[in-house]
């Protein structure tokens, strides 16, 4: 007995329906979820009340999240930066800054502070996995 089976599967259609097509819908949703869950961990500016969390950009394809601003890097690293010539945290315009070997103190610590993405993933990584798995039609293990 001979058995012949023919299938007409369109992988691109299946992937696109699950947000995994060339439009990167699942990746964009992942980036938006990470930004939302990182929010309580991102340092908050004192004085002006402005949050650094509002100064981010998600890449058009969802592949990266960039926190903008002249202070974003040292906030993320968590080290006081000083001017190379002045030795002051209030460096002159155009003066290069270097780490001073002292940790920053954060308003809202210990929740808000350095390495906010890593700390969020340590605390809520399972939630991120569940959200993405649900979005693409799967189940988190």
Regions found by a protein language model. Give the residues of each.
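Short, Lys/Arg-rich flexible segments
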Residues: 1-72, 81-141
